[in-house]
From Swiss-Prot:
Protein name per UniProt: Pentatricopeptide repeat-containing protein At5g08510
Listed Pfam families: E_motif, Eplus_motif, PPR, PPR_2, PPR_3
Region listing for Type E(+) motif, in residue ranges: 463-494
UniProt keyword annotations, A-Z: Repeat
Record PROSITE patterns: PPR (PS51375)
Source species: Arabidopsis thaliana (Mouse-ear cress)
PPR repeats: 46-80, 81-115, 116-146, 147-181, 182-213, 214-248, 249-279, 281-315, 316-346, 352-382
Similarity comment text for this entry: Belongs to the PPR family. PCMP-E subfamily.
One of the protein's GO biological processes: RNA modification
Entry-linked NCBIfam families: PPR (TIGR00756)
Region span, Type E motif: 387-462
Sample GO molecular function, one term: RNA binding
Length: 511
């Protein structure tokens, strides 16, 4: 910085104009305050200098200053270039409304740059980020020539809004696809929870010899493998990532750890976590702590948290979800309460709904139902169905009718068409021989339109076929064979005298 100031002083003394060089050096540091003062005192501003500063303000999250400079450019009698519009469109995407962008769009249209593919791509992206997909699509449709980035920008817009049907219609219409095109739709399906389609698209991508998956593709596919239990494909992706040097990318490493954890390979996940060494980030720690908690290794999760603090990594809200989950699975009430209390007092983290949910679960499992209910009453946010459902489940286990009635009443308001709450409450009444309550639940179910959503599981078969099995469904082409196998399994279970917990009630009281 001292060198720049000395050069600036030399220019002022000698009258040599080195503003362009000085400005670019200042923006590299960056020192926007000094750069703006230099710019404002410069007598012969040009579009190039305006563009550099407009871009700098956008990059450093000051989009309003970019707009101010864009307006000054016109007052100075200068014409914006295609670079100007590209930078100002990108800056406008940070606003809460699409109105400024529409005004800029109209000026862009009159400027003669409307056929510039690069600017149109940025304009489509900006409209999409602001949720103005109709405007983005209009720009796309009015273009006479569309290159691959333009197609990708429009597909990404639909993907971000969760409209995968529109995204796939465009994707299928593309004359030529690149790795970004494939990765965008794969990521879209994965982020929207449609893991089977994400995996199917990846397997189709592998057949396209003109494209090669990149590290973003790998990061997008691994969650699908994790949630579908596709360990073999996950292993193949790990090998591919290592061969292509993608394991230098922390996001690839974290996604791989998550995949192995969810596929039950916790020891492999731990080994990969140790391999990361100093490369580990907060996401790595959170993923490993959460995985250990999920697999019942609560002591290891807490030990890892202590190591995390020793190494100077600051926890966040996600960290404490994993820690409290470990306490829930380990039945460690006191430790859970200590951690919950430390969130605000030590780490300055405000507990969220999921943290309260963990605490309700923790207290409920050990029978501290009144304490759990008291905690719900102190929550700064409105308890959701998960919180009340957790309390109701605990009441069912411990046979507490009084608090169960409070929880069920809240659930009936939040989920009036969910029959599960009525069934649980009916079972609680029956276990305590309160048959009038059972009849009341039965009448409520008949009065209200309650339908239970069918449960299902995904199983990935050979090739790209993913089969969805629904409870009592017979639409599968091999359903006869499937049910034959199930009957044989049930027969063998009975022979082994497997015991099922079921509550038998008088026929007139059954739901």
């Amino acid at each position: 910085m001292n060198g720049i100031k000395q050069l600036h002083a030399h220019c002022l003394r000698t009258g040599v104009d080195e503003t362009k060089d000085l400005l670019q050096r200042l923006l590299l540091i960056p020192n926007l305050v000094y750069a703006r003062k230099l710019f404002d005192h410069h007598q012969n501003s040009c579009t190039f200098l305006y563009n550099k500063l407009i871009q700098a303000y956008y990059v450093h999250h000051q989009p309003h200053e970019s707009i101010v400079l864009y307006n000054l450019l016109s007052f100075d009698g200068l014409r914006p270039s295609h670079h100007t519009f590209n930078f100002i469109f990108a800056a406008s995407a940070s606003f809460s409304s699409a109105r400024p962008l529409r005004l800029l769009h109209s000026q862009f249209f009159r400027s003669g740059f409307e056929s510039d593919s690069f600017c149109c791509t940025t304009l489509i992206t900006a409209y999409a980020k602001l949720g103005a997909l109709c405007c983005a699509r209009r720009v796309f449709d009015e273009m006479s020539k569309r290159d691959v980035p333009v197609w990708n920008a429009m597909i990404t817009g639909y993907q971000r809004r969760g409209d995968m049907k529109a995204a796939m219609e465009l994707f299928d219409s593309m004359p030529r696809k690149n790795v970004t095109s494939w990765t965008t739709v794969i990521s879209g399906f994965s982020q929207n929870g449609n893991y089977s389609e994400a995996l199917k698209m990846f397997l189709c991508m592998e057949k396209d010899k003109s494209v090669k998956p990149n590290h973003i593709t790998v990061v997008s596919v691994l969650p699908a493998c994790a949630n579908l239990g596709e360990l073999e494909i996950g292993r193949r992706l790990e090998g591919y990532a290592r061969e292509n040097g993608f394991f230098d990318n922390i996001y690839v490493c974290n996604a791989t750890i998550e995949m192995y954890s969810k596929c039950g390979m916790i020891d492999v996940a731990k080994r990969l976590f140790e391999e990361l060494g100093n490369q580990r980030n907060l996401c790595s720690w959170n993923s490993m702590i959460g995985s250990l908690a999920t697999h019942g290794k609560h002591d290891e999760a807490l030990t890892l948290f202590a190591q995390m603090l020793r190494e100077g990594e600051k926890p966040d809200a996600v960290t404490f979800v994993g820690l409290l989950l470990a306490c829930v699975h380990g039945g460690m009430v006191v430790k859970g309460q200590e951690l919950f209390k430390s969130m605000e007092e030590v780490h300055k983290i405000s507990p969220k709904l999921e943290h309260y949910g963990c605490m309700i679960d923790l207290l409920g499992r050990v029978g501290k139902l009144q304490e759990a209910y008291d905690l719900i009453k102190t929550m700064p946010m409105k308890p959701d169905a998960v919180v009340w459902g957790t309390l109701l489940g605990a009441c069912s286990f411990h046979g507490n009718v009084e608090i169960a009635e409070i929880a069920s009443e809240a659930l009936f308001k939040l989920e009036p068409t969910n029959p599960g709450n009525c069934v649980i409450m009916s079972n609680i009444y029956a276990a305590n021989e309160k048959w009038d309550g059972v009849l009341r639940m039965r009448k409520l179910m008949k009065k209200e339109t309650m339908t239970k959503a069918a449960g299902y599981s995904y199983f990935v078969e050979v090739g790209v076929d993913v089969h969805k099995f629904t409870v009592e469904d017979k639409s599968h082409p091999r359903s006869y064979e499937i049910y034959q196998v199930l009957e044989e399994i049930f027969r063998r279970m009975k022979l082994e005298k497997s015991r099922f917990d079921s509550l038998l009630q008088p026929e007139q009281l059954c739901i």
